[in-house]
Amino acid sequence: MPNIKEVNSISKTLEELVLISGLSGYETNVKNYLSKQLKNKSLKTTSDVLGNLVCTMKGDETLPSVILFAHMDQLGFVVKKIEDNGFIRVEWVGGIPEKALASQDIVIVNNKNELVRGIIGNKSHHASQPDEKYIVTSIKNIYIDAGFKNKKD
């Protein structure tokens, strides 16, 4: 059974890992983090042309081999367009249900690897017409408000 120090170490590592942006197709930051963690444990890592990270650990050759694999990527969005009013239109990468999106906090990673916070815009319930109140907004109509006044911001 693991001791409290090991549990805390695993918890800290897991927290660090899930906070790294790793949208499908853009998992390099996650791969670099994992590679560093594994090298710190004196394990050799390699990467293939598809971006997969491979770590091999020598074991007892008389015992069966074990493989452990997991996704490094996350579901999310890519910026499709920035409107003249500064609102950001996005396109799906993965299968996030539309009904789960309204008013969610969003972190955008720009082309300089800087983080930009935003929120998925949502017409408030009390400002909605009766026929709008319980309709899920389509991804085509979803926008992110990151506080920009215009496209140039």
Model region roles, listed by residue range:
Residues 1-153:
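N-terminal hydrophobic/helix-forming segments and targeting peptides
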